[in-house]
Curated annotation (Swiss-Prot):
HAMAP family: PPV_L2 (MF_04003). InterPro entries: Late_L2 (IPR000784). A motif (Nuclear localization signal) lies at residues 1-9, 500-506. Minor protein of the capsid that localizes along the inner surface of the virion, within the central cavities beneath the L1 pentamers. Plays a role in capsid stabilization through interaction with the major capsid protein L1. Once the virion enters the host cell, L2 escorts the genomic DNA into the nucleus by promoting escape from the endosomal compartments and traffic through the host Golgi network. Belongs to the papillomaviridae L2 protein family. One of its GO terms (cellular component) is host cell Golgi apparatus. Keywords: Capsid protein, Cytoplasmic inwards viral transport, Disulfide bond, DNA-binding, Host endosome, Host Golgi apparatus, Host nucleus, Host-virus interaction, Late protein, Microtubular inwards viral transport, Phosphoprotein, Viral penetration into host nucleus, Virion, Virus entry into host cell. This is Minor capsid protein L2.
Length: 507
């Protein structure tokens, strides 16, 4: 079985690591150190044969100084090399000799000590002109100090100047209603002593400030009505002229986008329902992101809206103003109509827009006033005052009750009497055509209840009456029947006592 030959690293990579441990293969060591058989032949042969200038063994390939010479031709060919740029030299400043100071010639025969010259006693005194201001005599007294011996006192003569005479006036007013108690421990800056000094400056008849008349405030219950007059039609300090309606120009380029107006209001909030059928388990945020539809072009599928056929991408909504001033919602769509063999989808780009309807003005609904009536209103207070507010009703139709003087009512007016309600009733029903139907309510037989029943009125008199009492026969009793009517259909529900009798054994 043949084994594949594994490639090893380059000799220049193997030699540095194996040289340290002295484990280099012979071929790699001879090649790197130039000790192969060919290298030795050149080394030994160069001792007897001069091959100067040919560049043999230098690995440069330049052919030496004369270059390569083809066979049978004269002259050499120089291999082109990279030219070396010539750089200008740095100018060197010339350094000259330093300045030469003259040195006096020393007389060798002269003395070693130089004698001083005698210039004489008359020196010229220069005259200096000084310009200074003359200051007046100071008022500070001059102090003359004299020398004293030890043990004697020093005497200073102080001269007094002309002191300025000053007048100090003092005025004191005693207030009998206020007395300041003088204490010994007065704090710093305390001026509340028994003497009070007022310093004032006369200002003449000049009045400082402005006399502003005050307006009386209305503290009553009246309402202060104020009106605001609008001076200008604009609401800001710098009015701006009416700007033309803004429309995104990049959407209305007919060379790039096809303009399609959508009439379905689902385009604003649910545009995905116009391309594919709704998925109730997925509700994306359509106001912030774009929509990408994964559809197979080979499989033909019907879309809910024909204008959105083959649409694979819808951008997020963009709002603008249409020429009429209404709000317009725009979306950019990309269609995938044609597909190449490589799988590239090609389609037109369409601008879908939907114009929102104008907001209709609010309908004015007439509201009924609350708390108003056309009757007479009586307002009474604890003080006995009675106020009447007259309405549309005549004064004779109302009864005025005075709260000042109490009125006594008779016992007959205060006695409670039983009024018979529900006797001889008839049910009248009117339909939409105006026909009247009258139903006679027949009295049903009422089974007497078990036990004693007393429906009469007993009046208790503490004093016994004389004579035989008169007993009036009882009036016929008619039961009260309640019938619930439905105004819309004219139907009614009978009382349970009027239902059809059934053969049922009573216990």
């Amino acid at each position: 079985m043949y084994r594949l030959r594994r490639k090893r690293a380059a000799p220049k990579d193997i030699y540095p690591s194996c040289k340290i441990s002295n484990t280099c293969p012979p071929d790699i060591q001879n090649k790197i150190e130039h000790t192969t058989i060919a290298d030795k032949i050149l080394q030994y042969g160069s001792l007897g044969v001069f091959l100067g200038g040919l560049g043999i063994g230098t690995a440069r390939g330049s052919g030496g100084r004369i270059g390569y010479t083809p066979l049978g031709e004269g002259g050499g060919v120089r291999v082109a090399t990279r030219p070396t740029p010539v750089r200008p030299t740095i100018p060197v400043e010339t350094v000259g000799p330093s300045e030469i100071f003259p040195i006096d010639v020393v007389d060798p025969t002269g003395p070693a000590v130089i004698p001083l010259q005698d210039l004489g006693r008359d020196f010229p005194i220069p005259t200096v002109q000084v310009i200074a201001e003359i200051h007046p005599i100071s008022d500070i007294p001059n102090i003359v100090a004299s020398s004293t011996n030890e043990g004697e006192s020093a005497i200073l003569d102080v001269l007094r100047g002309n002191a300025t005479i000053r007048t100090v006036s003092r005025t004191q007013y005693n207030n009998p209603s206020f007395t300041v108690a003088s204490t010994s421990n007065i704090s710093a800056g305390e001026a509340s002593t028994s003497d009070i000094v007022f310093v004032s400056n006369g200002s003449g008849d000049r009045v400082v400030g402005e006399d502003i008349p005050l307006v009386e405030l209305n503290l009553g219950l009246e309402t202060d009505t104020s009106s605001v007059v609008q001076e200008t039609a604009f609401s800001s300090s710098t009015p701006i002229a009416e700007r033309p309606s803004f429309r995104p120009s990049r959407f209305y380029n007919r060379r790039l986008y096809e303009q399609v107006q959508v009439q379905d209001p689902r385009f604003v909030e649910q545009p995905q329902s116009m391309v594919t059928f709704d998925n109730p388990a997925f509700e994306p945020e359509l106001d912030e992101v774009s929509i990408i539809f994964q559809r197979d072009l080979d499989a033909l599928a019907q879309t809910p809206v024909p204008e959105f056929r083959d649409v694979v991408y819808l951008s997020k909504p963009t709002f603008s103003r249409e020429p009429g001033g209404r709000l317009r919602v725009s979306r950019l769509g990309k269609s995938s109509t044609i597909r190449t063999r490589l799988g590239t989808a090609i389609g037109a780009r369409t601008h879908f827009f939907y114009d929102l309807s104008s907001i209709a003005p609010e309908d004015s609904i007439e509201l009924l006033p609350l708390g108003e009536h056309s009757q007479t209103t009586v307002i009474s207070s604890n003080l006995g005052d009675t106020a009447f507010i007259q309405g549309e009703t005549a004064e004779d139709d109302l009864e005025v009750i005075s709260l000042e003087t109490p009125q006594l009512y008779s016992e007959e007016e205060l006695l409670d009497t039983n009024e018979s309600v529900g006797e001889n009733l008839q049910l009248t029903i009117t339909n939409s055509e105006g026909e009247v139907s009258i139903l006679d309510l027949t009295q049903s037989r009422v089974r007497p209840p078990f036990g004693t029943e007393d429906t009469s009125l007993h009046v208790y008199y503490p004093n016994s009456s004389k004579g035989t009492p008169i007993i009036n026969p009882e009036e016929s009793f008619t039961p009260l029947v309640i019938i619930a009517l439905n105004n819309s259909t004219g139907d009614f529900e009978l009382h349970p006592s009027l239902r059809k009798r059934r053969k049922r054994a009573y216990v």
